[in-house]
Amino acid sequence: MLAKQRFVLDTTAFTDNQLRELLGDGDLNLSVDRMLDLIARSRIKLNISCHMPPITYKEFTDYMTRYDCPEETLIKAETWIVKKTPNRYDTQIPSQIFYEYVHDIRERMNKGLRISETLLWEAGIQSIIMASRDVKKTEIESEVLGKAIKDLRKKYRSALRKGTLDSAPDLDVLLLAKELGAGVVAADDGIRVWAERLGLRFLNATSFPKMLKEYLKYYE
């Protein structure tokens, strides 16, 4: 019997756009179905198990349901993906990790504040200039404030969320991987960054199926 390998999968391990092209020629449902076939064969032949926290699994299945995923594919997911809630109380995380995370979030909040202040000043000045030229209030709201709000949403979201943990499913993926001594599979920069800080093995969503195929090629 081969030594058991475990992997904890994020939703992006199935839904990544590059993975769709790699496995399904751009078709999400076909890509997910083929990925699950690889997972099933690897479980039977290579003793490789793939896990998801329940909250992440629900996120994944809800996403697939919105894209009219066939029932057969959802049954495969239910069969071959092991659902387990991480032990949030006994899993040990170094205090330095918490320090780094709080520092990271604080820096992002400060950056988000600076972005907000800059955009507000720019919108305010532009509104005053347009008002002095007797531009209608509705036109100012449409051209200046509408654009400012759109830019603020985009830049603020990027400042606060890109490259860090921004959801409970993300955190559960890392906690479960830490508990099981498992690798992490995702296409999320935040998960990658914090998996590496925790000393966890990390595989990109497009690398994982390639690895499974390579293993299976030599077994079969």
UniProtKB/Swiss-Prot annotation:
A Pfam family of this chain: PIN_5
Alphabetized UniProt keyword annotations: Endonuclease, Hydrolase, Nuclease, tRNA processing
Q: InterPro entries annotated for this entry?
A: RNA_free_RNase_P
- Give the EC number(s) listed in the UniProt record: 3.1.26.5
What chemistry does it catalyse, as a reaction equation?
Endonucleolytic cleavage of RNA, removing 5'-extranucleotides from tRNA precursor
GO BP terms in the entry? tRNA 5'-leader removal
Q: A GO molecular-function term, please?
A: ribonuclease P activity
Return the similarity comment: Belongs to the HARP family.
Its job? RNA-free RNase P that catalyzes the removal of the 5'-leader sequence from pre-tRNA to produce the mature 5'-terminus.
Protein name, please?
RNA-free ribonuclease P
Organism in which the protein naturally occurs: Methanothermobacter thermautotrophicus (strain ATCC 29096 / DSM 1053 / JCM 10044 / NBRC 100330 / Delta H) (Methanobacterium thermoautotrophicum)
